[in-house]
Amino acid sequence: MEAIAKLIKVQLPNYLQKLPVPSSLSGFAELSPSDAIAVVFPFAVVSWLIGYSTYKFFQPKAVELPPSPKAKDTNCVNKCIDKTCKKVVHTVDIEDVGEKLVFCRCWRSKKFPYCDGSHNNHNEQEQDNVGPLIVKGKAN
């Protein structure tokens, strides 16, 4: 603690008294290069520290939503589709698309892999924003 007190009470005032600070703005032009560096460098460092501290203080904090109490396992996406399979894969032939197909991405659809709008209920319950995957065929 004595070292900090000595730094603030003795060494810092001595350092500031020795700085060649001009009395006017035109006096900066008359400073030698070494004197200019001795004045500008500490000013730049202190200005940067004040600016960075202000930025960090006012920087918006990330908001994490609490997990929904209705979700049993928040790490599991697929809660009911083909749970006996190691990996659920559905293939759709591109010629079968026709005008448009809407695929489920929330894993809640009763017509999986096609969307039946179940994501709307899921989004309300879980505060999520999941939507369907829409695949359109080429327009002739």
Swiss-Prot record:
Bilayer topology annotation: Single-pass membrane protein
Residues engaged in binding [2Fe-2S] cluster: C104, C106, C115, H119
Ranges in the topological domain labelled Cytoplasmic: 60-140
UniProtKB keywords: 2Fe-2S, Endoplasmic reticulum, Iron, Iron-sulfur, Membrane, Metal-binding, Transmembrane, Transmembrane helix
GO-annotated biological processes: intracellular iron ion homeostasis; regulation of autophagy
Lumenal side: 1-35
GO cellular component, one term: mitochondrial outer membrane
Record's cofactor remark: Binds 1 [2Fe-2S] cluster.
Cofactor (UniProt): [2Fe-2S] cluster
GO molecular-function term, one example from the UniProt record: 2 iron, 2 sulfur cluster binding
Localization (cell): Endoplasmic reticulum membrane
Name assigned to this protein: CDGSH iron-sulfur domain-containing protein 2 homolog
Source organism phylogeny: Eukaryota, Metazoa, Placozoa, Uniplacotomia, Trichoplacea
